[in-house]
Amino acid sequence: MSLIKEFKAFASRGNVIDMAVGIIIGAAFGKIVSSFVADIIMPPIGIILGGVNFSDLSIVLQAAQGDAPSVVIAYGKFIQTIIDFTIIAFAIFMGVKAINRLKRKEEVAPKAPAAPTKDQELLSEIRDLLKAQQEK
C-alpha cells in the first residue's frame, strides 16, 4: 500500500476526524473564554479592587534601556490565564459528566429475571416428575 493510500485510510477513520473537529472547536472555545475573562470578568473585578487593570499588573525586573524593552513578570496576565483555565476546565468537566450520564443510561442492561423462589422450584420439580411419569 502506498504512503498516500495509508495516510488516506488513517485520516478517514472516524476517530481521527472526530479528534480534529474537537481540536478546532476547542481552540475556538478557548478564544471565546479568553475574551470572556479579559473583557467581561476582569474589568468588574478590577473596579472592585480599586480600578486595577489586571493585564497591566507586573513586576519590573529591569527597566527599559534604549531600544530594549523592560524585563517584567506579568503576573496580571498570569492571573487571567489561570481564570481562563479554570473556566475551560469546568466547562470540559461538565461536558464529560453529561456525556458519561448519557452513556450510563444507554448501558443499563435489562435486569435478569429474578431467581425462582423455593415454591417455584418445588412446583417445577413436581411438574417434571409428573411429565416423566406420563411418558412411561
Curated annotation (Swiss-Prot):
UniProt GO molecular function: mechanosensitive monoatomic ion channel activity
Domain of life: Bacteria
Main location: membrane
Alphabetical UniProt keywords: Cell inner membrane, Cell membrane, Ion channel, Ion transport, Membrane, Transmembrane, Transmembrane helix, Transport
Keyword Membrane: yes
Entry-linked Pfam families: MscL (PF01741)
Location(s), subcellular: Cell inner membrane
Identification of the protein by name: Large-conductance mechanosensitive channel
Species whose genome carries this gene: Shewanella baltica (strain OS155 / ATCC BAA-1091)
Primary gene name: mscL
